[in-house]
């Protein structure tokens, strides 16, 4: 072997990787990467249809109509026995009701389940006579007549079901802020007794902008 061959052989020996410094990807590593990719795709799919737990407003769902803003109120139903009903009239703040002729375009209700929620509830909003005492019998009849959309909200293992909003359009009725006291949010507890620490309802009333309102949400 001449000198050049000896030098080349020595260089090749130096280039040989040290044992244990690198190894081919194992089957377990490959399976882990595939599983990670699948979980990532699944999380993206779920997140696309999963509502947030943040306070729901038209800011979070869609823009207000031009020239409109919204007023939000929160309702926390009391204990409702299994198969029974609860109703609460929409009472807006005085700073809003003094502009009682401003038109209302729609009402949005969002169901926010609390940690202990494990029931099925039906939620709707209805215009009710001023004389109505919102008794169980009266509310039961309103749910049965089919005159208003109803949101059926059920316990979901993820914490919140995909469809947790009810949008009630009033634009064709020419309803105004003064009419809101004639409307009520109604809740039916179907399968179990609903406890006081299981559910919160967020209600957004979209109405024409009033002088005390700020800029429209974006």
Swiss-Prot record:
Q: Write out the GO MF terms.
A: RNA binding; structural molecule activity
The name this protein goes by in its record: Capsid protein
Keywords attached to this Swiss-Prot or TrEMBL record, sorted alphabetically, are:
Acetylation, Capsid protein, Ribonucleoprotein, RNA-binding, T=3 icosahedral capsid protein, Viral nucleoprotein, Virion
Give the source's domain of life in one word: Viruses
Taken from the UniProt entry, a GO cellular component term is: ribonucleoprotein complex
Record has Transferase as a keyword: no
Which species? Cucumber mosaic virus (strain CS) (CMV)
Q: Which SUPFAM superfamilies match?
A: Positive stranded ssRNA viruses
């Amino acid at each position: 072997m001449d000198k050049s061959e000896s030098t080349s052989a020595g260089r090749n020996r130096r280039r040989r990787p040290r044992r244990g410094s690198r190894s081919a990807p194992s089957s377990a590593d490959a399976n882990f990467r595939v599983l990670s990719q699948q979980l990532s795709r699944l999380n993206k799919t779920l997140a696309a249809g999963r509502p947030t737990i943040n306070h729901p407003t038209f800011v979070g769902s869609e823009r207000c109509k031009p020239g409109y803003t919204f007023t939000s109120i929160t309702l926390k139903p009391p204990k409702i026995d299994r198969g029974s009903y609860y109703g609460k009239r929409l009472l807006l703040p005085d700073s809003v009701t003094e502009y009682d002729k401003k038109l209302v375009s729609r009402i949005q209700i969002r169901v926010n389940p609390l940690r202990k929620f494990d029931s099925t509830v039906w939620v709707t909003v209805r215009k009710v006579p001023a004389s109505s005492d919102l008794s169980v019998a009266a509310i039961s009849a309103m749910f049965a007549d089919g005159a208003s959309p109803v949101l059926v909200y059920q316990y979901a293992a993820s914490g919140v079901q995909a469809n947790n909003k009810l949008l009630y359009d009033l634009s064709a009725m020419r309803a105004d802020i003064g009419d809101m006291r004639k409307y009520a949010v109604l809740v039916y507890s179907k399968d179990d007794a609903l406890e006081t620490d299981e559910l919160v309802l967020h209600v957004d009333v979209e109405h024409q902008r009033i002088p005390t309102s700020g800029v429209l949400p974006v």
